[in-house]
From Swiss-Prot:
Top-rank lineage group of the source organism: Viruses
Organism this protein belongs to: Acanthamoeba polyphaga mimivirus
The protein, known as: Uncharacterized protein L167
Biased amino acid composition, Low complexity: 246-262
Region (Disordered): 226-263
Polar residues bias locations: 226-244
Amino acid sequence: MDNINCLFNELLVIIIDFLSDNDKIKFITTCSRLYWFIDKIHYNSVYDYNKISHLSFVDKFKRIRFHAVNAGSIPSIVTDLVLDNNFTDSLKTCNLSKLLRIKLNFHQYKKNRNHILSNVKIDCSNSITISQIRYKTLKPTRLFSLIEPFSLLRPFILSDPYPINRIQIKGYDRDTNYGIPVHTPPEEILEDFGKHLEDIDKLITKNYKKFFPIKKSRPAYIPIVSRNSESSRQSNLNSPNDSVKFNEFNKSNKSTKTNPNNIHNIVTTMNSNKNFHKNKYKYQNRIIPKHSKYPKKFSKNKYH
């Protein structure tokens, strides 16, 4: 009968081990008969050493976490060790045979890496990162301040351990008092900001002229070639300044416009192609005003 009871107990322990730790406690505390198994089963979750150290079956816990301040207080049954940031001792004298995980900073790891077993998982996430150093040493003053205008142009604040009287960060050179910049009047800030805007304006203008050059405008006159040899020779000798412009021609008398003898003095714009004949081989560059009469030998239907 006793053998049957022992077999039943072993089978019951195996069944309980499949449950989670919370379900194990709930199941065991249902009656005094099952409570007898409380020190016969194992607990798989991570528990704090200070909360379970008074129990007689503390060796049944597979994961025990301990926060160490000094090396003398670390127990030998610890599996998850967390070193405090102020921990400066060595782990050489500690018995860490059951250690599975350790959490420490970079300086502590550099000091005790030879005393940690190779199968131990190391976590250095609580070490100081580059972003934390940048935030502490280059912390800006009032990044999103609504009280002082242009507060982003102020230099950065350095921490107290830097014994300097003058700093220069990102192009700003200001007087400091124990690492803290001296107060600058708003007028000087506005003046500096105006200088930066002026430099930016000059740079934009320079680049615009470089990549988008200004095109030279075409002259508002064209040389007139007439069938008369004397008039053509005279038009070639005339300079652009001596020629009659289109606007001046419009202001002149009607007799000047309609007189065919003055046709070589007329200067038209480059886009007035309607006044040219389409037959450019026989009557090349001959200009006849639109309001003037056609010669008899020209046909309106043929050339216009």
